[in-house]
Amino acid sequence: MLKRVFDIVFSAGWLVGFAPLLLVVAILVRLKLGSPVLFVQERPGLRARPFRMVKFRTMTDECGPDGELLPDEQRLTSFGRFLRATSLDEFPEMWNVLLGDMSVVGPRPVLLRYVSRYSPFQARRMEVKPGVTGWAQINGRSAIGWDEKFALDVWYVDHRTFWLDMRIVVMTFFKVLARSGAERAEGAEPLGEFRGDGK
């Protein structure tokens, strides 16, 4: 109950307080990357229930002569890299928190296709709502492998408290200021494809 109250107050305050910044970023995304401004993708939530996660776009839709999208590294602009490094692309996820699909703190939502590849241990990370930030994010982010990431997520599930959430929120701000480990492809995972068994 306390966690949900915190989620509502924090996300509502965030969206209102950062509304001018969100508007500026949205305008810049529209000018530099085109439309749509938001990137929307289904992700697994609590008990694997799909929800539509929203983020700011960070890549263009440029295609090659064959009509196929260019490789991610060619579509990612310096502006997109900046959004990722500062985590500004993730600010709209607070809307998901306000709706109740996500929490401020919890395991980061991965791709839907990964759910069937989880071991029973790894699947335990879905016993709580996914978060905007989490225990794994302040303990390595994309610098750790899938096994360690999922182990940290399950550790959080077993040890979660309101005060641990507060610690994670505070430490996240320091991580964002340091711009640590945020490079990734749009809609993809910073660790590469998860194929099961920690791979």
Q: How does the language model describe each region?
A:
Residues F39-R75, T133-A151:
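Short, glycine-rich, amphipathic interfacial segments at transmembrane boundaries or analogous
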Residues I8, M126-K199:
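C-terminal terminal-structure detector
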Residues D72-K129, V169-T172, V176:
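A short, structured surface patch at a secondary-structure boundary
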